[in-house]
């Protein structure tokens, strides 16, 4: 209403292409999902499985393998800001951050067994993908994860142990990515 470009502000056809209409759709989608949706663990597992493909393609892009040939027509100056199937590095980082947060939480709260191992693998790959994504937004996601997880996990000794495993895994992944980058 206060913009000089009311039409563009509503439809979002300029700048970052996010207008009031898109924000209303986001809000409406949230309300519908929140009111009518029932979270099932199968949905979370499917999300993690699909996320693994995105993360793996992001890691291979970091290694300049370009398996999907998405970067074949990108201008050389913009080559590093596009990755995986998402394109923009910040959108990719936001998605991988969701994957990392979910897999870390599920790993930390699992009782053990195959699901715990599956969530650990998802967490491991998501950590590597977040680091190789090379986005500044990754720092914010990591600070949120490592800052908020203890609030839930430190209620018992098992949570403290799992948090320690998560921290140790993260630093191990950092060392491995650094070693790969140097060779």
Where are these regions (language model features)?
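Alpha-helical transmembrane segments of multi-pass inner-membrane proteins
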Residues: 15-182
């Amino acid at each position: 209403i206060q913009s000089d470009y009311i039409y563009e502000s509503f439809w979002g056809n300029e700048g970052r292409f996010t207008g009031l209409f898109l924000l209303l759709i986001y809000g409406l989608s949230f309300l519908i999902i929140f009111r009518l949706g029932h979270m099932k663990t199968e949905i979370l597992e499917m999300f993690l499985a699909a996320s693994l493909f995105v993360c793996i393609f992001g890691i291979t892009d970091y290694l300049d393998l370009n398996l999907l040939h998405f970067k074949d027509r990108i201008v050389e100056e913009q080559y590093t800001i596009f990755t995986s199937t998402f394109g923009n590095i910040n959108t990719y980082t936001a998605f991988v951050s969701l994957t990392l947060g979910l897999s870390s939480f599920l790993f930390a709260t699992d009782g053990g067994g195959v699901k715990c191992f599956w969530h650990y693998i998802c967490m491991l790959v998501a950590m590597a993908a977040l680091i190789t994504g090379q986005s500044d937004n990754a720092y914010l996601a990591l600070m949120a994860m490592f800052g908020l997880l203890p609030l839930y996990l430190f209620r018992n000794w098992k949570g403290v142990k799992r948090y320690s495993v998560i921290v140790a895994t993260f630093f191990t992944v950092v060392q491995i990515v650094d070693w790969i980058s140097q060779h």
